[in-house]
From Swiss-Prot:
GO molecular function: NADP binding; shikimate 3-dehydrogenase (NADP+) activity
Active site (UniProt): K65 (proton acceptor)
Binding site for NADP(+): E77, G126, A127, G128, G129, A130, N149, R150, T151, L152, T153, K154, M213, G238
Positions of shikimate binding: S14, K15, S16, T61, N86, D102, Y215
Family, per entry: Belongs to the shikimate dehydrogenase family.
Enzyme Commission code(s) on record: 1.1.1.25
Listed GO CC annotations: cytosol
Keywords for the protein's UniProt record, in alphabetical order: Amino-acid biosynthesis, Aromatic amino acid biosynthesis, NADP, Oxidoreductase
Protein name: Shikimate dehydrogenase (NADP(+))
Pathway(s): Metabolic intermediate biosynthesis; chorismate biosynthesis; chorismate from D-erythrose 4-phosphate and phosphoenolpyruvate: step 4/7
Enzyme class: oxidoreductase
Complexes and interactors: Homodimer.
Recorded name of the encoding gene: aroE
Length: 269
């Protein structure tokens, strides 16, 4: 049986093992997928041991996406552009191949929701590894992006890096203008700590739609709950993005694209 896993910290909230179990059953693949709590002090050593022991691939979640990227030997274009990965695959010669399927998962979910329109104004909150993985696909979809972060330097560096691909500007979190954005995306991991983003509430009230890249299956994330409390009508968490990126990772590993509709339309997990 082929072994796979998702690495993160925290990790107990992850639904990835259940998702990939459903994918494996659906496509008749013989594989095992588990969740592993990564040790920040030993992450690289433990991950390399995981592959040395014969594992075929893994997903990477916060806070290890950039560190995992540095361990790879080959990269997809989207991983190279992001300089962060959420997927690793062990090649036949033992080398590691890095990909980033986050952007594909987000774009497919926004399209499913009908929230991805050309040349709309998009506010992204956070400039970490999760953001790096979605900027290229969003810019390729002709989004006009305002990227904000608590520290301006990090947002500016990222905006400068992606400027050749489309319209993107950087802004400090505390200086976001109170205006209507067609879509506001929370790309921070604050929800994992039970926290939400410190921005002017009116920005969410005015938004055409609000999307949280985090999820908490069975209940609202803090960001989603806050947006709903403010009266925002179009609000969604990142479960659809999770399922979408998982499907693209599964395809990279197994060579077959699973059907995500049963997971999104039925309460399977």
């Amino acid at each position: 049986m082929d072994n796979y896993a998702v690495w993160g910290n925290p990790i107990k909230q992850s639904k990835s093992p259940q998702i990939h179990k459903i994918f494996a059953e659906q496509t008749k693949q013989c594989m095992e997928y588990k969740a592993i709590l990564g040790d920040p002090e030993k992450f690289e050593t433990e991950l390399l041991r995981f592959f040395a022991d014969g594992a075929k691939g893994c997903n990477i979640t916060a806070p290890f996406k950039e560190r995992a990227y540095s361990l790879a030997d080959e990269y997809s274009e989207r991983a190279l552009t992001a300089e962060a990965c959420n997927t690793l695959k062990r090649l036949q010669d033992g080398r590691l191949y890095a990909d980033n399927t986050d952007g594909a998962g987000l774009v497919s979910d926004l399209e499913r929701l009908g929230w991805l329109k050309s040349k709309q104004s998009l506010l992204i909150i956070g400039a970490g590894g999760a953001t790096k993985g979605v900027l290229l696909p969003l810019l390729q979809a002709q989004q006009n992006i305002t990227l904000c972060n608590r520290t301006l330097t990090k947002a500016r560096d990222l905006a400068d890096k992606f400027a050749p691909y489309g319209n993107i500007q950087a802004m400090k979190l505390s200086e976001i203008p109170v205006q209507k954005f067609d879509l506001v995306i929370n790309a921070t991991s604050l929800g994992l700590q039970g926290k939400t983003v410190d921005i002017e509430p009116e920005i969410l009230r005015l938004a055409g739609a609000v999307y949280d890249m985090q999820y908490d299956k069975g209940k609202d994330t803090p960001f989603v709950a806050w947006a709903k409390a403010l009266g925002v009508q179009n609000v969604h968490d990142g479960f659809g993005m999770l399922v979408g990126q998982a499907a693209h990772s599964f395809y990279l590993w197994r060579g077959i694209m699973p059907d995500i509709k049963p997971l999104l339309e039925n309460d399977l997990i």
